Amino acid sequence: MDVLFSIAKTVSDLKKKVVVGTIYTNVEDIIQQTNELIRTLNGNTFHTGGIGTQPQKEWNFQLPQLGTTLLNLDDNYVQATRSVIDYLASFIEAVCDDEIVREASRNGMQPQSPTLIALASSKFKTINFNNSSQSIKNWSAQSRRENPVYEYKNPMVFEYRNSYILQRANPQYGNVMGLRYYTASNTCQLAAFDSTLAENAPNNTQRFIYNGRLKRPISNVLMKIEAGAPNINNLTILPDPTNQTTWLYNPDQLMNGTFTIEFYNNGQLVDMVRNMGVVTVRTFDSYRITIDMIRPAAMTQYVQRLFPQGGPYPYQAAYMLTLSILDATTESVLCDSHSVDYSIVANVRRDSAMPAGTVFQPGFPWEQTLSNYTVAQEDNLERLLLVASVKRMVM
């Protein structure tokens, strides 16, 4: 992997720096590095493709050395360099595409394609120019079964869920109480609802509890907690739990209430939050949200009409809350909304009409991967996202 990364980094730097008018001394280092790369690759033959619709191709390396000059780079020099850049970039993309459509139930983080396996041999170690990439460091640590650290913005840690839990419901569902929840990507939205607005609750306070669990623990979490839940704050016709009928979810947001969020790691309480705003949590893999809906001591006639004593109840009072994971670190590779690498992998596998593998579901859906995130999937995903990041460098 480090050899492929070094080739891609060299090509990327060469493409950026070799332009008409540049003084040669400013690009001399990258030119010499490219020539070292060419000397090492020349005389070797590699094969890519052959899976799905990917064409088989043979790469016979006989590239010319890049010359030197005492002057500024002219158009002829740049054109000659471009031909080398284009060949190397095409080679890298072909290797990456070939690697992306392969998976293994064991040792999935190790190279799987013939070319990447060949590049891992000792004869190509002189190409290892740059090993400073955090992706390479994480892959190296993971391959040694150490604990890498991945940093994510808006990490996709929540499985997609859009449902509700009923704590009370009459046969006509005109008097209901329960918890509506929506989780997806990096957000968890909750709405504790009650048609009677805690009318008969002890001390006019109705309690709701929601328990959630992540597939992988996250650490150094920066989180935003705010009132409201936009995805579930709307008039909705919902099926009843037995799918025999439907009922009307018609929430009116209530500000009277309190909440407590408890964060746990391996069953041990780690942190507790009771306030809105931006908060930090050291680490957690599960959480419990307790909401207390409080009936106001006094209400205007307009509010009383929304929740008439004894019914009928056209609305539900709803205390709403949204948790958003802004930043976090993990020891597991995840899909990140700020990176296109996962999309690159999914698109290559789809466009190549890749046959169904033994590790991931057809179509490479993140939701299904996250819902049953196995060690084999994590190992393969580590490799695939690294390869996608290499391909992105030369695209």
From Swiss-Prot:
Entry's localization field: Virion
Residues making up the signal peptide according to the UniProt record: none
Database matches in InterPro entries: Capsid_hemagglutn, Rotavirus_A/C_VP6, Virus_capsid_a-hlx_vir
SUPFAM superfamilies: A virus capsid protein alpha-helical domain, Viral protein domain
Cellular component GO terms, alphabetical: viral envelope; viral intermediate capsid
GO MF term set: host cell surface receptor binding; structural molecule activity
Keyword terms: Capsid protein, Intermediate capsid protein, Virion
Gene3D superfamilies, per database record: 2.60.120.170, Viral capsid alpha domain (1.10.1350.10)
Record carries keyword Disulfide bond: no
Residue spans crossing the bilayer: none
Pfam families: Rota_Capsid_VP6
Keyword Acyltransferase carried by entry: no
GO BP annotations, alphabetical order: fusion of virus membrane with host plasma membrane
UniProt-listed HAMAP family: Rota_VP6
Assembly notes: Homotrimer. Interacts with the inner capsid protein VP2. Interacts with the outer capsid glycoprotein VP7.
Role, per record: Intermediate capsid protein that self assembles to form an icosahedral capsid with a T=13 symmetry, which consists of 230 trimers of VP6, with channels at each of its five-fold vertices. This capsid constitutes the middle concentric layer of the viral mature particle. The innermost VP2 capsid and the intermediate VP6 capsid remain intact following cell entry to protect the dsRNA from degradation and to prevent unfavorable antiviral responses in the host cell during all the replication cycle of the virus.
UniProt similarity note: Belongs to the rotavirus VP6 family.
Protein name: Intermediate capsid protein VP6
Species: Rotavirus C (strain RVC/Pig/United States/Cowden/1980) (RV-C)
